[in-house]
């Protein structure tokens, strides 16, 4: 009899209260960077029934209309009158300038704060991401798109998913064990109808895309039986509370720092992107099948305090050689990261990353997903 171990990841939709906050924070960041690429932004959002509070520290030469940004984003996500939360809500702005004590360290190219950041890659999907996270995300991408196109008319914006995979004794995915989907809905739709549509029209097509069997899966669709009250009317939302959803679904470690609302001088964001970039190129170069990078920084210091490579026993060459190659190939200073990953260029919108995840995106050309260092890594290791 086969022995299995189990691993689970979850995901939440753009209409989840915490994700509303993340997207508003990043929409404000995008607005600042659009007209002033050197803006310093640390923006936090709190949303609840009938109210959005925007706070933080912003130093910029441009003007941003906070209320307009908030209302447009709520409309875009899909909240309408009658849902307990919509763009007619009150908006309170409590923003002031960045502390000069922080600015003096960042101005010379140093990190905006101390901290540890992680990034990883694993050979489970084409984009070298953990499969459980990818499946959880794909389910909600499909469900959200079907809601917005009115293909599923009863669905509302607040949605969650969770996928459990069974791994064999060799650490390979054997099958999907269980799937949880909770979707906010209108008053009139029955639980049986919701369950049928979610399984047949949303989940099964996603599984087919990845050549996974839908047989014998344990499904939990709206397991409480009712999910009418949702969004910020059901739960308060705050920026930065979905950091595992934003990254690897718990498959790799996380340093604890959130991304949204932070300009690229904040290494919580920029260095986490860089760690993914490094790890993905290592795996793509076939130096390992699985890789996790840890970076650490000190406030005001231009270079990382430490760089750690962990290949979990899957490396094809000595880990020390990989570490040496990383130090030769990648400039992991805050300014080096900003330049290499085009973090102030405006080629992508941070608010789009806040909606469906910052890592492993295939629908957006994010520089940290590019495999542009594979040959240099191989050359550095003399393969």
Swiss-Prot record:
Annotated stretches, region: Flexible loop: 98-108
Transport is among the record's keywords: no
PROSITE patterns registered for this protein in UniProt: ADOMET_SYNTHASE_1, ADOMET_SYNTHASE_2
Sites where the protein binds Mg(2+): 18
Keyword Chloroplast: no
Top-rank taxon: Bacteria
A Pfam family recorded for this sequence: S-AdoMet_synt_N
Pathway listed: Amino-acid biosynthesis; S-adenosyl-L-methionine biosynthesis; S-adenosyl-L-methionine from L-methionine: step 1/1
CC per GO annotation: cytosol
Subcellular location: Cytoplasm
Substrates-to-products reaction catalysed: L-methionine + ATP + H2O = S-adenosyl-L-methionine + phosphate + diphosphate
Positions with a binding annotation for K(+): 44
Cofactor dependency: Mg(2+); K(+)
Record-level GO BP terms: one-carbon metabolic process; S-adenosylmethionine biosynthetic process
GO terms, molecular function: ATP binding; magnesium ion binding; methionine adenosyltransferase activity
Residues the record lists as binding L-methionine: 57, 98, 235, 266
Record note on cofactor: Binds 2 divalent ions per subunit.
Protein EC: 2.5.1.6
Binding site for ATP: 16, 158-160, 226-227, 235, 241-242, 258, 262
Alphabetic keyword roster: ATP-binding, Cytoplasm, Magnesium, Metal-binding, Nucleotide-binding, One-carbon metabolism, Potassium, Transferase
Protein function: Catalyzes the formation of S-adenosylmethionine (AdoMet) from methionine and ATP. The overall synthetic reaction is composed of two sequential steps, AdoMet formation and the subsequent tripolyphosphate hydrolysis which occurs prior to release of AdoMet from the enzyme.
HAMAP family the record matches: S_AdoMet_synth1 (MF_00086)
Family to which the UniProt record says this protein belongs: Belongs to the AdoMet synthase family.
Record note on quaternary structure: Homotetramer; dimer of dimers.
Protein's UniProt name: S-adenosylmethionine synthase
Gene for this chain: metK
């Amino acid at each position: 009899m086969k022995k299995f171990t189990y691993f689970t990841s979850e995901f939440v939709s753009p209409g989840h209260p915490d994700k509303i906050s993340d997207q508003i924070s990043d929409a404000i960041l995008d607005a600042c960077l659009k007209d002033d690429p050197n803006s310093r932004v640390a923006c936090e959002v709190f949303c609840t029934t009938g109210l959005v509070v925007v706070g933080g520290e912003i130093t910029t030469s441009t003007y941003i209309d906070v209320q307009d940004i908030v209302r447009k984003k709520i409309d875009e996500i899909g909240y309408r009158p009658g849902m307990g939360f919509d763009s007619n809500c009150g908006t309170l702005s409590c923003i002031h300038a960045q502390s000069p004590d922080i600015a003096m360290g960042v101005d010379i190219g140093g990190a905006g704060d101390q901290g540890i950041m992680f990034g990883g890659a694993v050979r489970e999907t084409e984009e070298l991401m953990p499969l459980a996270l990818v499946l959880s995300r794909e389910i909600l991408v499909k469900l959200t798109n079907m809601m917005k196109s009115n293909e599923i008319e009863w669905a509302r914006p607040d949605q969650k998913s969770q996928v459990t995979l069974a791994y064999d004794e060799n650490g390979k995915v054997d099958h999907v064990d269980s799937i949880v989907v909770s979707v906010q809905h209108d008053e009139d739709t029955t639980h049986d109808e919701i369950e049928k549509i979610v399984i047949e029209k949303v989940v099964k097509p996603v599984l087919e895309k990845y050549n996974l069997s839908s047989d014998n899966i344990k499904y939990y669709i709206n397991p409480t039986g009712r999910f009418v009250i949702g969004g910020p009317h059901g739960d308060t939302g705050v920026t930065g509370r979905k950091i595992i959803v934003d990254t690897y679904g718990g498959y790799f470690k996380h340093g604890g720092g959130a991304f949204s609302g932070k300009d690229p001088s904040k290494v919580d964001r920029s260095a986490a992107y860089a760690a993914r970039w490094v790890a993905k190129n290592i795996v793509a170069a076939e130096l390992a099948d699985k890789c996790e990078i840890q970076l650490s920084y000190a406030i005001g210091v231009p270079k990382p305090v430490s760089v750690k490579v962990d290949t979990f026993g899957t490396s094809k060459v000595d880990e020390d050689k990989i570490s040496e190659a990383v130090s030769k190939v990648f400039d992991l200073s805050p300014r080096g990261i900003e330049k290499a990953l085009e973090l102030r260029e405006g080629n992508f919108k941070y608010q789009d990353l806040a909606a469906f995840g910052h890592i492993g995106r295939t629908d957006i050309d994010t520089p940290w997903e590019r495999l542009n260092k594979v040959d240099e890594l191989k050359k550095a290791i003399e393969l």
